[in-house]
């Protein structure tokens, strides 16, 4: 009985014929290792226990953007006082009531402190009335007021209260304007919740003390220091820096762009003066606009950012078609 011939290369006859592509390698034989840098083709899975090689030194995902308003270095380029005025006016018109009401409330509080202090000082002082009659028989009187120790104490306490209220107002308005610069929603209450009030008070005392010392040196050094320290309170409110660091940061910021700082200061002064010329009622607009210019300048010169003004969207609907005559 005949049997079919065995084909060369059959597994039953390992010695016969050449092994084809579908044959199995002998035991202990492995495929040659891949050349350096060779990996599995895209889309395949790595065998268990195999890890991809680490990236070369210095390689990694790109860093994310820094938080708004918190730069790592100064980038004063790109500041324009015209842009500052335009941005500030746009933001004021979008938040007019929210900005005007706090300024009005602070003005009433300041007037109350000044009026109460003046009234108590006069009431606690000694007054002496002297009557005069001239040769024509016309009588007149003069009143001499002599301040007593009690009146002096009241005046001193009134100055302290006024100074604290001014710093509180400054910090509160800056807090609201900084939130506007960050694009956060603000309310009237935002301007009465100043951030970092303790740092602001100490920073304000430091500025007043150094300005007073500079004023003793022929006045001009005090004016110069007051100018270069104009952003110290903003740094304390916005970045929680210490009083000394706030003053140093303000000096560095102003020094990075003296021209822009001067133009911004003049723009703020103009806004307030125009408000005074309008029977002081215009200061309800001038003070918020000046504060917004101040915040814009501080952010731009210190390398921070502000949310740019948003243009109104076009009306919803299909554009009109061609009109037939």
Swiss-Prot record:
Signal peptide segment: none
Biased composition (Pro residues): 24-70
Cellular localisation: Cell membrane
A single GO cellular-component term on record: plasma membrane
Record's bilayer topology term: Multi-pass membrane protein
Keywords carried by this UniProt record: Cell membrane, Membrane, Transmembrane, Transmembrane helix
Region described as Disordered: 1-75
Entry superkingdom: Bacteria
Family: To M.tuberculosis Rv2560.
Name assigned to this protein: Uncharacterized protein Mb2590
Species of provenance: Mycobacterium bovis (strain ATCC BAA-935 / AF2122/97)
Organism classification: Bacteria, Bacillati, Actinomycetota, Actinomycetes, Mycobacteriales
